[in-house]
Amino acid sequence: TGNSNLQPAAMTLTATATVNPACGAYVTAPMDFGVNTGAVASNIDRTARFSLTCVNRSPFQVGLDNGSHADGAGNRRMRVGSSGALLPYELYRDAARTQRWGNVLNSTTVSGTGTGAAQDLTIYGRVPPAAGTSTPPGAYTDTVTVTITY
């Protein structure tokens, strides 16, 4: 009842899966330079933090743009309402505030590798002393866009 001409056949099956890199972030502590009276007489240093979660072993770079009120040279400035009064400030990658945090890949960005868990990054901010005798009163603000490249 059997067929003696049957031969075993072998073939290969390839299993594949693709895991795309992915990152997500949210601000956990915004930059707040506090309340000041009159001219800024000395550096005001503060920090902000945000949390970044990227897929395990995914390389990433985090960049910051110059903000909504930067001048033509890219210097960051906060503005009070629609009055036009501006207050210069800067954002840095290091606690010594010597490495400006920008948006140029492999140069002024912060790079790292995802772990699959939340990683906290700190932004170091500084408002330098004012050149004039007083700073017009008001609530100064700016909006900086954070870009995550992965």
Regions found by a protein language model. Name each.
Residues 1-83, 109-150:
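N-terminal small/polar-rich segments of proteins
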Residues 65-67, 90-94:
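Predominantly extracellular/luminal cell-surface or secreted proteins
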Residues 74-77, 91, 98:
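Intrinsically disordered, low-complexity sequence elements enriched in Ser/Thr/Gly/Pro
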Residues 95-97, 150:
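Solvent-exposed strand-loop boundary residues in beta-sheet-rich modules
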Residues 97-106:
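Solvent-exposed adhesion/ligand-recognition segments of exported proteins
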